[in-house]
Every structure is written in structure tokens, then in C-alpha cells.
């Protein structure tokens, strides 16, 4: 694999470095002897320029330059080898963001089906509560962006929401796509794909965690999902109801104090704030790191090198190419 090639390059660089040091040493020894012999039989060059650029001084300068270059190469080779060895030994799971929002209307059944077809490990979805207590898939608190209706989700019943078109604004071929209930999505996903269920806090859904956990338990789906939220108190509630539910704390930044976050089994962090040291610290606490939301190969490769455990993306097929 690539990491084997990097290791061979690393070994070659090490031999080159040793060789350069040896060569530099021999140059000094040889120059010292010749200088001593010539000083007894010949005159020194009258020009300082000639003395500087003729003979051993030039060789020494060139050797030092080569030595510096090989040292830099060796450092970079060591870092690349470590990163590639880590990447080759660790499986990184893939989550389709909102089901795969680049290929289908977000948080719809079509998006979940795409996540399955793209062989994603997880479909990441967002859930909120309607005015009559139904748990549905929706990211925004306002329905305008995805359905065209300028209304807050907590002001409408499920019957009213079910009449809205959640697909046509994405593409006409998805005309008639409905906003699904969490139960519908779980029923379809069972045995096909895991779900990352992000519980949104909007100030109007204080009992949403209890309802979401009940739906998960009633459908025997605990082992096939994780529950995440930016509201840490929601994670506490979930763990209190059912300690077996795997929970993740969604963060826009990589905060400190990870040791105190007992209600979180893993951390879901915006990729721009993830560093290798953060991942190592989380892993030392026995907690995984999920990176969101990546849609470019360069960013994905950096996260692979950092050692993250899961990548959330709108384009899961692209991640497999990294």
C-alpha cells in the first residue's frame, strides 16, 4: 500500500542522512590534511574570493545544504508515514448528511434511500416536534427553505405539515416528497442502515427526548442508532432514560473539558476545528470523534490523517475515493 512506499522512502531518507553526515566528516578530514600539506609547499591564494570558492569550502557548503534538505525531507516522510499507517489500520465510517443532501431533498425518504444505495454506514437526520407532538424530520425551525411555507414547525400539526412539498424546491423530479415521521424512517432503515438522530432544540420541545427515545425503543432500534444534539442536557436526559443509547455531543468548536462530558459517548465536531491532538485526547478518554460536514477531498484527507472515526458528508460516494 501507500504507507509501505512511504516507509521505504523514510528508510531511504534515513540512509541518505547518515551518508551525508559521513561524507561531510570525510570532507573535513581530507581538507585538513591537504591544507596542512599545501601550507608547507605552496603559497596561499592571494585573493579572498578564490580562497572562499575553491576547494573544500565549496564542498562543505554544498554538503550542509544537502544535509538540511534531507533532514526536512526525513521529517515530512516520518509524519506522512505515521498518518498513512494510522489511516490504513483504522476504518472510518461514513454518514450521509441529512440523508445525502447533495443528491436528494434533505431529511426525506428519498434521501434515506440514497444513503442506503451509496452504502453509507449512517444516515444523519434531524428531528423536531410538531404542535400535536409528532416527531418529524426537519433541520430548520422554519419551513420556508425546504417547503416554501414561512412558518415555524411547532405552530403546525402533522396533518398540516404532511400536505407540504419537501422535494420540488430541490428538484422537480422529487415533486410531492413529504416530510416523514421518525417512525417511518426507522421502519425503512431497519436492517439497511444505521441512523444518527440529531435532536434539535428550538425552545418549544422540552419533552422531545423522551418521545424520541420511546420511538427508538418501541422499534427495537437502540443498537442501530446514535442520538446526538447540540443541547448537552438532551444527552443527559437520554442517558437517564436509557443508558444503552449511544450519544454524541455536537459542537461547532473543539471545546476543552471533555473529561466532564460523561453523557456523551462521542463528539461530533465541525471539521475546521478538529486537530490531531484533539482526536488523540478524545481517544485517550475512550470517546470517538465524528467530523462534519465535509464535501471536498482535501478536507476529507486531512480528517483521515487526524484519525477521526466518522465523516459526515453530503456526498458519501466521494469519501470512499479518499
Where are these regions (language model features)?
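Hydrophobic alpha-helical segments
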Residues: 1-34
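Cytoplasmic membrane-interface regions of multi-pass membrane proteins
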Residues: 27-47
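Internal/C-terminal transmembrane anchor helices
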Residues: 41-79
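C-terminal active-site rim and adjoining tail of enzyme catalytic domains
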Residues: 53, 74-81, 249-322
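Membrane-interface segments at or immediately adjacent to transmembrane helices
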Residues: 74-124, 128-131
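Hydrophobic faces of well-ordered beta-strands that scaffold small-molecule active sites
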Residues: 94-96, 123-125, 195-199, 225-228, ...
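Short, acidic/polar
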Residues: 104-114, 180-185, 209, 250-260, ...
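Metal-dependent phosphodiesterase/phospholipase catalytic core, i.e.
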Residues: 139-246, 264, 269, 283-285
